[in-house]
């Protein structure tokens, strides 16, 4: 089980400062979609250069032109790139093919997929590396989370690793860990904490204890 820090509402210098505080406790640093929109893939490049020991995920949420966008993110230094589960199989296949060429990983984000179980089965057959259940900001505001969906993909997915994102905090982490996802993605649960290093340290401890 690995811990991923999601960075969404920062610029590049702020991102670097934030990662410095918690780098010893995290395995993956995510350059979130808002950061990519504001800063471009330069953000991926600069974080990878600053923290070569960490895996960097580029949250591109690819919906089309899978191969091309994977190629560009790979050139910037991304280790893992996201594709949306709601896209068509051709886009996912193109992304997987290019990722294999570049020796990179694909994480499929199941945000807003209505039938998680049947779509996860289909995607699992396409050779992706991770399948991630994800409750976005707008639904988190309505009090929703992806904990039940995690159970569904844990029971369904046979080849890919499993991941969960959206609204995970220190007090809800034990519930997530019970399901044994391969990757736990935390954003505000760390970035909004008064003591980020202490929170990340406690989260990592819980994850290691598993």
Swiss-Prot record:
UniProt keyword annotation of Lyase present: yes
Gene3D superfamilies: Aldolase class I
Listed pathway(s): One-carbon metabolism; formaldehyde assimilation via RuMP pathway; D-fructose 6-phosphate from D-ribulose 5-phosphate and formaldehyde: step 1/2
Annotated keywords: Carbohydrate metabolism, Detoxification, Lyase, One-carbon metabolism
Biological process terms in GO annotation: 'de novo' pyrimidine nucleobase biosynthetic process; formaldehyde assimilation via ribulose monophosphate cycle; L-ascorbic acid catabolic process; one-carbon metabolic process; response to toxic substance
Protein function: Catalyzes the condensation of ribulose 5-phosphate with formaldehyde to form 3-hexulose 6-phosphate. Together with HxlB, may act as a formaldehyde detoxification system.
Catalysed conversion reaction: D-ribulose 5-phosphate + formaldehyde = D-arabino-hex-3-ulose 6-phosphate
EC number(s) on file: 4.1.2.43
Induction statement: By formaldehyde, under the control of HxlR. Not induced by methanol, formate, or methylamine.
UniProt cross-references to InterPro entries, sorted A to Z: 3-hexulose-6-phosphate_synth, Aldolase_TIM, HPS/KGPDC, OMPdeCOase_dom, RibuloseP-bd_barrel
Protein name: 3-hexulose-6-phosphate synthase
Chain's gene name: hxlA
Molecular-function annotations in GO: 3-dehydro-L-gulonate-6-phosphate decarboxylase activity; hexulose-6-phosphate synthase activity; orotidine-5'-phosphate decarboxylase activity
PANTHER family: 3-KETO-L-GULONATE-6-PHOSPHATE DECARBOXYLASE SGBH-RELATED (PTHR35039:SF3)
Recorded family membership: Belongs to the HPS/KGPDC family. HPS subfamily.
Pfam family, one: OMPdecase
Keyword Endoplasmic reticulum among UniProt keywords: no
